[in-house]
């Protein structure tokens, strides 16, 4: 059974891209360079929907530039879940994941990023790298908040995270982590 791929169509001639990383529209309340999405379903929802199914795969064939955003999102979700514990309350989790989203992070294409063979970004072009950094930061912030909504939605009091989500902290998508 093959892995699930992104359903978002990306045209490299008309869509915004930095190297081969697509800057897809987001439904977000955080400030950043992402355009607002035309629909209720965006790449962040797709990352959250496909995370559990795709986390079992060690190989992933990239079929479109949107798949690269999906890969980054799945790796970031795994990183966020690794910072949560079964005893972490919702308010603590908001603080923890906000810090994780805003922490210094390596950009695709820079030394230290785990999947540099997948991403080809113009490291010498500082404007493009700044655009990519602010987009990824906006993406990480929104993804962390939506992840919290899903992880803490199954309990009535929003006091403790869902053990079914936390069970995926041991899984490594493509044997990589951010």
From Swiss-Prot:
Similarity-based family: Belongs to the ARPC3 family.
GO (cellular component) term, any one: actin cytoskeleton
InterPro entries hit by this protein: ARPC3, ARPC3_sf
Function of the protein: Functions as a component of the Arp2/3 complex which is involved in regulation of actin polymerization and together with an activating nucleation-promoting factor (NPF) mediates the formation of branched actin networks.
Localization: Cytoplasm, Cytoskeleton
Biological processes per GO annotation: actin cortical patch organization; actin nucleation; Arp2/3 complex-mediated actin nucleation; establishment of mitochondrion localization; regulation of actin filament polymerization
Keywords: Actin-binding, Cytoplasm, Cytoskeleton, Isopeptide bond, Ubl conjugation
Other noteworthy facts: Present with 1920 molecules/cell in log phase SD medium.
Record gene name: ARC18
Record-annotated disulphide pairs: none
Organism: Saccharomyces cerevisiae (strain ATCC 204508 / S288c) (Baker's yeast)
Subunit field text: Component of the Arp2/3 complex composed of ARP2, ARP3, ARC40/p41-ARC, ARC35/p34-ARC, ARC18/p21-ARC, ARC19/p20-ARC and ARC16/p16-ARC.
Protein's recorded name: Actin-related protein 2/3 complex subunit 3
């Amino acid at each position: 059974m093959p892995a699930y791929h992104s359903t978002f169509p990306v045209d490299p001639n008309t869509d915004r891209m930095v190297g081969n990383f697509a800057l897809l529209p987001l439904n977000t309340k955080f400030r950043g360079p992402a355009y607002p999405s035309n629909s209720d379903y965006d790449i962040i929802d797709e990352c959250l929907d496909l995370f559990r199914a795709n986390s079992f795969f060690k190989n992933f064939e990239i079929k479109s530039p949107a798949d690269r955003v999906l890969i980054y999102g799945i790796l970031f979700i795994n990183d966020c879940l690794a910072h949560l514990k079964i005893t972490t309350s919702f308010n603590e989790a908001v603080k923890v994941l906000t810090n994780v989203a805003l922490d210094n992070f390596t950009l695709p294409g820079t030394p230290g990023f785990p999947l540099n063979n997948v991403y080809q970004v113009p490291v010498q072009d500082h404007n493009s790298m700044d655009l990519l950094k602010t987009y990824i930061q906006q993406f990480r912030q929104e993804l962390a908040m939506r992840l919290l909504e899903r992880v803490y939605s199954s309990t009535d009091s929003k006091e403790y995270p869902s053990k079914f989500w936390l069970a995926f902290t041991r899984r490594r998508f493509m044997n990589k982590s951010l």
